[in-house]
Amino acid sequence: MNKIIVNGGKSLKGEVNINSAKNSVLPIIAASILSGDKCIIENAPMLEDVFVISEVLKSISSEVDIDRDNNKIIIDTSNICNSEPCSELVKKLRASFLIMGPMISRFGNFKISLPGGCNIGTRPIDLHLKGLNALGADINIGYGYVEAKADKLKGNKIYLDFPSVGATENLMMAAVLAEGDTIIQNAAEEPEIEDLAKFLNSMGANIVGAGTDTINIIGVKDLKGVVHKPIYDRIEAGTFMTAAAITRSKIKLNGVNEGHLRPIIAKLTEIGVKIDTNGDSMIVDGNHQLKPVDIKTMPYPGFPTDMQAQTMALLTSIEGTSIVTETIFENRFMHATEMKRMGSNIKIDGRSAVIEGGNELTGCEVKATDLRAGAALILCGLVARGSTNVTDVYHIDRGYANIEKKLQALGAEIYRI
């Protein structure tokens, strides 16, 4: 099954349930290493990335049981006896590098191949390594591997040159068992950072300030296993909000956190979409006169880079000129080439894309170049004339569970072959 076929022109209606956040679950799975005990993740999304990082943990002798029927993951890291995970697995998923902090903190040594993931630009690991070095780890890089050793990590003050989510998570996990106090300045503020801190604190860590630009961590001696339910996936929610907008439809989302979605809500509201939230549910009505806007991706609480491609898809359907500026990754406009094959008028100028919206799109074969690009091409297919064939859908499966089934339930004519 390597294609998703979308026959455009159908309006959407009904309800869709949003999964818990992939970008919370991946670091939480990594953090389970710190306890040496059993941790249970409830309401876990059944995604390819989740399966890969689970296999990474198995490759260092952890026990990981994935209960797909009940969306539960049970992790027992008490018998870890290998300090080098399978390199082929690590190369599949960039988030595999998140186990470095927990492994060094608990065991004092670790070796890992350079990580993989979506090809959306250079995402250097230097911030991770500089921070781990500041905590006392001796770092060596060579022949495609990173090796770290430390008798015992010691707390320190760390300033991140950029508020990297992965570096913030890795250093936070490394510091919880370090001796003394650690302060991470210019830390990432994403909701997933807060969720990881909540998980770690429930294990017995002492973390204050997660979700702000300064995180204080007082090291503790050990951590215990816990049960945790992650936050909702704000990017999946944003994708379905955009699906309602691009099809000029009205749908209900169940499983949202309005606070986490504020940047997306603000921009869609500016476009003309009507959004009403009640508790953890949201009504999104795109059946209004929509107008072009300018968007600039920024670290949270700015507009998320992970919603850039989907929003570009929406803007191609709105008459007028929009400008999208990508400030996080330098190579995240590959979907524009595929959208142009469908009839979109998009011009790339460095880190900006100029969209002359309103052209009718025509279905054709397009390639999902990365996770969010794949979702964006499906959105284009929902409104294109004729049939759109999206290939390389393994990218999409990394972050969306059964996206075609969820859209089918809303009335879209979409299927997988």
From Swiss-Prot:
SUPFAM superfamilies noted in UniProt: EPT/RTPC-like
Record-annotated membrane-spanning stretches: none
Enzyme class: transferase
Residues bearing PTM 2-(S-cysteinyl)pyruvic acid O-phosphothioketal: 118
Record Pfam families: EPSP_synthase (PF00275)
Residues where phosphoenolpyruvate binds: 22-23
EC number(s) per entry: 2.5.1.7
Pathway: Cell wall biogenesis; peptidoglycan biosynthesis
Family stated for the protein in its record: Belongs to the EPSP synthase family. MurA subfamily.
Reported function: Cell wall formation. Adds enolpyruvyl to UDP-N-acetylglucosamine.
NCBIfam families listed in its UniProt record: murA, PRK09369.1
Protein name: UDP-N-acetylglucosamine 1-carboxyvinyltransferase 2
Source species of the chain: Clostridium tetani (strain Massachusetts / E88)
Gene from which this protein is expressed: murA2
